[in-house]
Protein backbone atom coordinates (compact mmCIF):
# COMPACT_ATOMS: atom_id res chain seq x y z
CA UNK A 1 0.00 0.00 0.00
CA UNK A 2 1.22 3.50 -0.83
CA UNK A 3 1.30 5.56 2.40
CA UNK A 4 -0.73 8.75 2.60
CA UNK A 5 2.40 10.92 2.93
CA UNK A 6 3.49 9.78 -0.55
CA UNK A 7 0.03 10.20 -2.07
CA UNK A 8 0.02 13.80 -0.85
CA UNK A 9 3.26 14.61 -2.69
CA UNK A 10 3.54 15.95 -6.22
CA UNK A 11 6.26 14.78 -8.60
CA UNK A 12 9.04 17.34 -9.01
CA UNK A 13 8.45 19.20 -12.26
CA UNK A 14 11.20 20.56 -14.49
CA UNK A 15 10.68 23.16 -17.21
CA UNK A 16 10.57 21.58 -20.68
CA UNK A 17 8.75 24.34 -22.58
CA UNK A 18 10.58 25.02 -25.88
CA UNK A 19 12.21 28.43 -26.38
CA UNK A 20 15.34 29.63 -28.17
CA UNK A 21 16.47 31.57 -25.08
CA UNK A 22 16.18 29.28 -22.05
CA UNK A 23 16.91 31.10 -18.81
CA UNK A 24 14.82 29.04 -16.40
CA UNK A 25 17.12 26.43 -14.79
CA UNK A 26 20.19 28.34 -13.55
CA UNK A 27 22.44 26.41 -15.90
CA UNK A 28 25.96 27.54 -16.79
CA UNK A 29 25.58 29.34 -20.13
CA UNK A 30 28.87 28.12 -21.61
CA UNK A 31 29.79 24.65 -22.83
CA UNK A 32 33.42 23.52 -22.63
CA UNK A 33 35.70 24.15 -25.63
CA UNK A 34 35.71 21.37 -28.20
CA UNK A 35 39.31 20.33 -27.51
CA UNK A 36 38.61 19.82 -23.80
CA UNK A 37 35.42 17.88 -24.55
CA UNK A 38 37.40 15.75 -26.98
CA UNK A 39 39.92 14.89 -24.26
CA UNK A 40 37.07 13.90 -21.95
CA UNK A 41 35.57 11.71 -24.67
CA UNK A 42 38.93 10.03 -25.25
CA UNK A 43 39.04 9.09 -21.58
CA UNK A 44 35.42 8.00 -21.75
CA UNK A 45 36.28 5.50 -24.50
CA UNK A 46 38.52 3.70 -22.00
CA UNK A 47 35.62 3.11 -19.58
CA UNK A 48 34.63 -0.59 -19.33
CA UNK A 49 30.85 -0.26 -19.68
CA UNK A 50 30.32 -3.83 -18.45
CA UNK A 51 31.94 -3.03 -15.08
CA UNK A 52 30.62 -1.21 -12.04
CA UNK A 53 32.26 2.17 -11.35
CA UNK A 54 34.71 2.75 -8.51
CA UNK A 55 32.34 2.86 -5.50
CA UNK A 56 34.54 5.45 -3.78
CA UNK A 57 35.27 7.53 -6.91
CA UNK A 58 38.84 7.87 -5.62
CA UNK A 59 40.35 9.58 -8.67
CA UNK A 60 37.52 12.11 -8.92
CA UNK A 61 37.68 12.73 -5.17
CA UNK A 62 41.37 13.57 -5.46
CA UNK A 63 40.61 16.15 -8.15
CA UNK A 64 37.66 17.59 -6.20
CA UNK A 65 39.69 17.78 -2.99
CA UNK A 66 42.28 19.87 -4.81
CA UNK A 67 39.59 21.98 -6.52
CA UNK A 68 37.86 22.84 -3.22
CA UNK A 69 40.99 22.95 -1.05
CA UNK A 70 40.05 20.08 1.27
CA UNK A 71 41.12 16.48 1.91
CA UNK A 72 39.57 13.45 0.24
CA UNK A 73 38.36 12.10 3.59
CA UNK A 74 36.18 15.22 3.93
CA UNK A 75 34.08 14.33 0.86
CA UNK A 76 30.93 12.36 0.13
CA UNK A 77 29.86 12.34 -3.51
CA UNK A 78 26.30 12.04 -4.75
CA UNK A 79 24.26 11.79 -7.92
CA UNK A 80 23.72 15.52 -7.72
CA UNK A 81 23.20 17.43 -4.47
CA UNK A 82 19.59 16.21 -4.42
CA UNK A 83 20.77 12.73 -3.46
CA UNK A 84 22.95 14.12 -0.67
CA UNK A 85 20.00 16.12 0.68
CA UNK A 86 18.06 12.86 0.97
CA UNK A 87 20.97 11.22 2.80
CA UNK A 88 21.13 14.07 5.29
CA UNK A 89 17.39 13.93 5.93
CA UNK A 90 17.79 10.20 6.60
CA UNK A 91 20.92 10.37 8.75
CA UNK A 92 20.60 13.49 10.92
CA UNK A 93 18.19 13.01 13.81
CA UNK A 94 15.38 10.52 14.34
CA UNK A 95 12.72 10.64 11.65
CA UNK A 96 10.06 11.86 14.07
CA UNK A 97 12.12 14.96 14.90
CA UNK A 98 11.39 18.07 12.77
CA UNK A 99 13.47 19.70 10.04
CA UNK A 100 13.85 23.50 10.02
CA UNK A 101 13.56 25.30 6.67
CA UNK A 102 13.43 29.07 6.01
CA UNK A 103 11.07 29.67 3.07
CA UNK A 104 10.89 30.34 0.18
CA UNK A 105 13.87 28.19 -0.75
CA UNK A 106 15.02 25.21 -2.82
CA UNK A 107 12.08 22.72 -2.80
CA UNK A 108 14.16 19.54 -2.37
CA UNK A 109 14.72 20.24 1.34
CA UNK A 110 11.01 20.02 2.03
CA UNK A 111 10.43 17.16 -0.41
CA UNK A 112 13.14 14.98 1.16
CA UNK A 113 11.68 15.50 4.63
CA UNK A 114 8.12 14.79 3.49
CA UNK A 115 9.14 11.57 1.70
CA UNK A 116 10.52 10.32 5.02
CA UNK A 117 7.51 11.52 6.98
CA UNK A 118 9.57 14.06 8.92
CA UNK A 119 7.72 17.02 10.46
CA UNK A 120 8.65 20.47 9.17
CA UNK A 121 9.30 23.76 10.90
CA UNK A 122 8.95 26.34 8.12
CA UNK A 123 9.63 30.01 8.82
CA UNK A 124 8.83 32.72 6.28
CA UNK A 125 11.72 35.00 5.39
CA UNK A 126 11.42 38.66 6.34
CA UNK A 127 10.80 41.52 3.90
CA UNK A 128 14.51 41.55 2.98
CA UNK A 129 14.46 37.79 2.27
CA UNK A 130 16.61 37.21 5.35
CA UNK A 131 15.92 34.75 8.16
CA UNK A 132 13.27 35.88 10.65
CA UNK A 133 15.40 35.07 13.68
CA UNK A 134 12.85 35.95 16.35
CA UNK A 135 10.18 33.69 14.84
CA UNK A 136 12.77 30.98 14.15
CA UNK A 137 13.97 30.90 17.76
CA UNK A 138 10.38 30.83 19.00
CA UNK A 139 9.55 27.77 16.88
CA UNK A 140 12.91 26.05 17.47
CA UNK A 141 12.42 26.25 21.24
CA UNK A 142 8.91 24.86 20.85
CA UNK A 143 9.36 22.18 18.14
CA UNK A 144 13.03 21.22 18.76
CA UNK A 145 14.17 20.56 15.16
CA UNK A 146 17.61 18.94 14.88
CA UNK A 147 18.31 19.55 11.18
CA UNK A 148 18.18 22.78 9.18
CA UNK A 149 18.75 23.56 5.51
CA UNK A 150 20.17 26.89 4.35
CA UNK A 151 20.72 27.68 0.66
CA UNK A 152 23.67 30.09 0.68
CA UNK A 153 23.00 32.07 -1.54
CA UNK A 154 19.32 31.29 -1.35
CA UNK A 155 17.41 29.98 -4.35
CA UNK A 156 15.23 31.64 -5.67
CA UNK A 157 15.86 34.95 -3.88
CA UNK A 158 19.59 35.14 -4.69
CA UNK A 159 20.72 36.74 -1.42
CA UNK A 160 23.00 35.48 1.33
CA UNK A 161 21.32 34.93 4.70
CA UNK A 162 22.94 36.76 7.62
CA UNK A 163 25.73 34.50 8.81
CA UNK A 164 25.12 35.46 12.44
CA UNK A 165 21.50 34.32 12.22
CA UNK A 166 22.52 30.88 10.95
CA UNK A 167 25.03 30.65 13.80
CA UNK A 168 22.33 31.61 16.33
CA UNK A 169 20.12 28.81 15.02
CA UNK A 170 23.04 26.37 15.12
CA UNK A 171 23.75 27.35 18.73
CA UNK A 172 20.28 26.06 19.59
CA UNK A 173 21.14 22.49 18.63
CA UNK A 174 20.25 22.55 14.92
CA UNK A 175 22.62 20.66 12.61
CA UNK A 176 23.17 23.11 9.74
CA UNK A 177 23.39 22.05 6.09
CA UNK A 178 24.83 24.98 4.15
CA UNK A 179 23.95 24.44 0.50
CA UNK A 180 26.57 26.37 -1.46
CA UNK A 181 25.41 25.36 -4.94
CA UNK A 182 26.11 28.93 -6.11
CA UNK A 183 29.34 29.42 -4.15
CA UNK A 184 31.38 30.32 -7.23
CA UNK A 185 29.16 33.37 -7.82
CA UNK A 186 29.22 34.63 -4.22
CA UNK A 187 32.64 33.66 -2.83
CA UNK A 188 31.08 33.31 0.64
CA UNK A 189 31.37 29.99 2.46
CA UNK A 190 30.98 28.04 5.71
CA UNK A 191 33.72 25.64 4.61
CA UNK A 192 35.98 26.27 7.60
CA UNK A 193 33.11 25.49 9.98
CA UNK A 194 32.25 22.31 8.08
CA UNK A 195 35.82 21.02 8.39
CA UNK A 196 36.04 21.69 12.14
CA UNK A 197 32.55 21.14 13.54
CA UNK A 198 30.24 18.15 13.85
CA UNK A 199 27.07 20.24 13.48
CA UNK A 200 27.76 21.74 10.04
CA UNK A 201 28.27 20.42 6.51
CA UNK A 202 28.60 22.23 3.20
CA UNK A 203 27.08 21.09 -0.10
CA UNK A 204 28.63 21.98 -3.44
CA UNK A 205 27.75 20.90 -6.98
CA UNK A 206 29.28 20.76 -10.44
CA UNK A 207 25.87 21.44 -12.00
CA UNK A 208 26.14 25.23 -11.74
CA UNK A 209 29.62 25.40 -13.26
CA UNK A 210 29.10 23.68 -16.58
CA UNK A 211 28.62 20.00 -15.72
CA UNK A 212 24.89 19.66 -15.03
CA UNK A 213 24.60 16.62 -17.30
CA UNK A 214 27.11 14.67 -15.19
CA UNK A 215 25.08 14.97 -11.95
CA UNK A 216 27.89 15.25 -9.40
CA UNK A 217 27.10 16.65 -5.96
CA UNK A 218 29.62 17.07 -3.16
CA UNK A 219 29.18 17.02 0.62
CA UNK A 220 32.08 18.47 2.60
CA UNK A 221 32.34 17.78 6.30
CA UNK A 222 34.44 16.58 9.19
CA UNK A 223 35.67 13.00 8.84
CA UNK A 224 33.39 11.67 11.58
CA UNK A 225 30.30 13.07 9.87
CA UNK A 226 31.42 11.86 6.44
CA UNK A 227 31.78 8.31 7.83
CA UNK A 228 28.21 8.33 9.13
CA UNK A 229 26.71 9.76 5.93
CA UNK A 230 28.55 7.11 3.91
CA UNK A 231 26.58 4.45 5.79
CA UNK A 232 23.37 5.51 4.03
CA UNK A 233 24.96 6.23 0.65
CA UNK A 234 23.81 3.95 -2.15
CA UNK A 235 26.56 1.83 -3.77
CA UNK A 236 27.99 2.92 -7.12
CA UNK A 237 26.00 6.16 -6.95
CA UNK A 238 28.30 8.19 -9.22
CA UNK A 239 28.52 6.65 -12.69
CA UNK A 240 31.79 5.74 -14.36
CA UNK A 241 31.23 8.23 -17.24
CA UNK A 242 30.52 11.01 -14.73
CA UNK A 243 33.64 10.20 -12.72
CA UNK A 244 35.89 10.11 -15.77
CA UNK A 245 34.50 13.17 -17.55
CA UNK A 246 34.32 15.36 -14.44
CA UNK A 247 37.94 14.53 -13.65
CA UNK A 248 39.11 15.68 -17.09
CA UNK A 249 36.88 18.76 -17.23
CA UNK A 250 37.97 19.96 -13.78
CA UNK A 251 41.67 19.53 -14.50
CA UNK A 252 42.00 20.59 -18.12
CA UNK A 253 39.06 23.01 -18.09
CA UNK A 254 39.73 24.80 -14.82
CA UNK A 255 41.14 27.98 -16.35
CA UNK A 256 38.22 28.13 -18.79
CA UNK A 257 35.74 27.68 -15.93
CA UNK A 258 37.21 30.40 -13.73
CA UNK A 259 37.24 32.85 -16.63
CA UNK A 260 33.64 32.14 -17.61
CA UNK A 261 32.39 32.28 -14.02
CA UNK A 262 33.69 35.84 -13.82
CA UNK A 263 31.91 36.65 -17.07
CA UNK A 264 28.64 35.37 -15.59
CA UNK A 265 29.14 37.55 -12.49
CA UNK A 266 29.82 40.57 -14.70
CA UNK A 267 26.71 39.84 -16.77
CA UNK A 268 24.62 39.42 -13.62
CA UNK A 269 25.53 42.92 -12.50
CA UNK A 270 24.86 44.35 -15.96
CA UNK A 271 21.44 42.65 -16.10
CA UNK A 272 20.60 43.96 -12.64
CA UNK A 273 21.45 47.53 -13.66
CA UNK A 274 19.49 47.27 -16.92
CA UNK A 275 16.43 45.69 -15.28
CA UNK A 276 16.30 48.53 -12.75
CA UNK A 277 15.80 50.93 -15.67
CA UNK A 278 12.63 49.17 -16.87
CA UNK A 279 9.57 50.94 -15.48
CA UNK A 280 7.43 48.65 -13.34
CA UNK A 281 10.17 46.07 -12.71
CA UNK A 282 11.54 45.55 -9.21
CA UNK A 283 14.73 43.48 -9.35
CA UNK A 284 16.50 42.15 -6.27
CA UNK A 285 20.29 42.04 -5.73
CA UNK A 286 21.83 38.59 -6.22
CA UNK A 287 24.98 36.68 -5.30
CA UNK A 288 24.05 33.72 -7.50
CA UNK A 289 23.80 33.17 -11.28
CA UNK A 290 20.18 34.33 -11.47
CA UNK A 291 18.01 37.32 -10.59
CA UNK A 292 14.61 37.48 -8.90
CA UNK A 293 12.24 40.17 -10.12
CA UNK A 294 8.69 41.36 -9.52
CA UNK A 295 6.28 43.30 -11.72
CA UNK A 296 2.83 44.82 -11.06
CA UNK A 297 1.25 42.11 -13.23
CA UNK A 298 0.36 38.47 -12.53
CA UNK A 299 3.51 36.40 -12.98
CA UNK A 300 1.86 33.93 -15.34
CA UNK A 301 0.98 36.80 -17.69
CA UNK A 302 4.56 38.10 -17.72
CA UNK A 303 5.79 34.53 -18.23
CA UNK A 304 3.52 34.07 -21.25
CA UNK A 305 4.45 37.45 -22.75
CA UNK A 306 8.13 36.53 -22.51
CA UNK A 307 7.42 33.11 -24.01
CA UNK A 308 5.68 34.77 -26.97
CA UNK A 309 9.03 36.45 -27.56
CA UNK A 310 10.84 33.10 -27.39
CA UNK A 311 12.31 33.67 -23.91
CA UNK A 312 11.78 31.15 -21.10
CA UNK A 313 12.15 32.12 -17.41
CA UNK A 314 10.89 30.52 -14.19
CA UNK A 315 7.58 31.55 -12.64
CA UNK A 316 8.18 31.36 -8.87
CA UNK A 317 5.05 33.21 -7.78
CA UNK A 318 3.62 30.02 -6.23
CA UNK A 319 6.29 30.12 -3.51
CA UNK A 320 5.77 31.68 -0.08
CA UNK A 321 6.10 35.46 -0.18
CA UNK A 322 6.91 35.66 -3.90
CA UNK A 323 3.63 36.86 -5.38
CA UNK A 324 4.12 38.31 -8.90
CA UNK A 325 7.77 37.17 -8.91
CA UNK A 326 9.80 35.44 -11.60
CA UNK A 327 13.41 34.24 -11.75
CA UNK A 328 15.77 34.64 -14.69
CA UNK A 329 19.10 32.85 -15.07
CA UNK A 330 22.14 34.73 -16.32
CA UNK A 331 22.92 33.61 -19.85
CA UNK A 332 25.37 34.66 -22.53
CA UNK A 333 25.37 38.42 -23.28
CA UNK A 334 23.31 37.96 -26.44
CA UNK A 335 20.73 35.86 -24.55
CA UNK A 336 20.55 38.42 -21.77
CA UNK A 337 20.06 41.21 -24.30
CA UNK A 338 17.17 39.33 -25.87
CA UNK A 339 15.63 38.81 -22.42
CA UNK A 340 15.98 42.48 -21.50
CA UNK A 341 14.37 43.55 -24.76
CA UNK A 342 11.58 40.98 -24.34
CA UNK A 343 10.94 42.03 -20.74
CA UNK A 344 10.61 45.70 -21.64
CA UNK A 345 8.25 44.84 -24.51
CA UNK A 346 6.23 42.51 -22.27
CA UNK A 347 5.73 45.14 -19.59
CA UNK A 348 4.66 47.71 -22.20
CA UNK A 349 2.23 45.21 -23.72
CA UNK A 350 0.66 44.39 -20.36
CA UNK A 351 0.40 48.04 -19.30
CA UNK A 352 -1.31 49.03 -22.57
CA UNK A 353 -3.91 46.26 -22.18
CA UNK A 354 -5.21 47.64 -18.87
From Swiss-Prot:
Pfam assignment, any one: Aminotran_1_2
Pathway annotation from the record: Amino-acid biosynthesis; L-histidine biosynthesis; L-histidine from 5-phospho-alpha-D-ribose 1-diphosphate: step 7/9
InterPro entries: Aminotransferase_I/II_large, HisP_aminotrans, HistidinolP_aminotransfase, PyrdxlP-dep_Trfase, PyrdxlP-dep_Trfase_major, PyrdxlP-dep_Trfase_small
Cofactor section: pyridoxal 5'-phosphate
Keyword Transferase: yes
A single MF term (Gene Ontology): pyridoxal phosphate binding
Reactions listed under catalytic activity: L-histidinol phosphate + 2-oxoglutarate = 3-(imidazol-4-yl)-2-oxopropyl phosphate + L-glutamate
EC number, as in UniProt: 2.6.1.9
Any one Gene Ontology BP term: L-histidine biosynthetic process
Entry-annotated residues carrying N6-(pyridoxal phosphate)lysine: 208
Keywords in alphabetical order: Amino-acid biosynthesis, Aminotransferase, Histidine biosynthesis, Pyridoxal phosphate, Transferase
CDD domains assigned to the protein according to its UniProt record, in alphabetical order: AAT_like
Subunit-structure text: Homodimer.
Family label: Belongs to the class-II pyridoxal-phosphate-dependent aminotransferase family. Histidinol-phosphate aminotransferase subfamily.
Entry protein name: Histidinol-phosphate aminotransferase
Species, as recorded: Aquifex aeolicus (strain VF5)
Gene it is expressed from: hisC
